[in-house]
Amino acid sequence: SLSVNISEFYLSELMNKIEEYYNEKLSLIKTDFFVAKYDDCLLKGDLERSVEVLQNIIENAVKYGDGKIIDIDLSQEDGCQLITVKNSGCTLSDTELPHIFESFWRGANADNIKGSGLGLYICRQLMHKMGGEIFAEIKDGYMYVTAVFVKV
């Protein structure tokens, strides 16, 4: 089951885990990985589940993008911390975008790629259980997936 243990953790704890995991992994496949500078803050949620959510978003960015660029941008607004994963080479169409958080849904770009169609659906369930949100947009051939965390 998708249980979450709500507590408080620092944004830097979350980002350090993500950077440690992906710096080497992405350099091995020659993907440029960039994490923007950010102001540390306390977040409300489940640290391990938050790591899972970001890993899932990044794995999708690698699988369905062109593998050239993964950028993570961080911003704060309205008492929330936004973490946006941007990837180049988005092959999803605008008409498919509204469906990416549905269970078992897979885009036309997923034909030769392994997956269950559950990743982003689970991410959304987890973000909602932590009081947050997740959304996506396509701009100029880039895919942006943003996880919204509640600040303490």
Model-derived regions: residue spans:
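Short alpha-helical Gxxx[C/S/T] motif in the catalytic ATP-binding
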Residues: 119, 123
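Short conserved segment of the HATPase_c
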Residues: 92-105
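Short helix-loop "hinge" at the ATP-lid/N-box region of the Bergerat-fold HATPase_c
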Residues: 61-62
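A conserved beta-strand-to-alpha-helix junction within the catalytic ATP-binding
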Residues: 5-20
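Short beta-strand/loop element within the Bergerat-fold HATPase_c
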Residues: 69-79
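Conserved catalytic submotifs in the C-terminal HATPase_c
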Residues: 5-8, 32-42
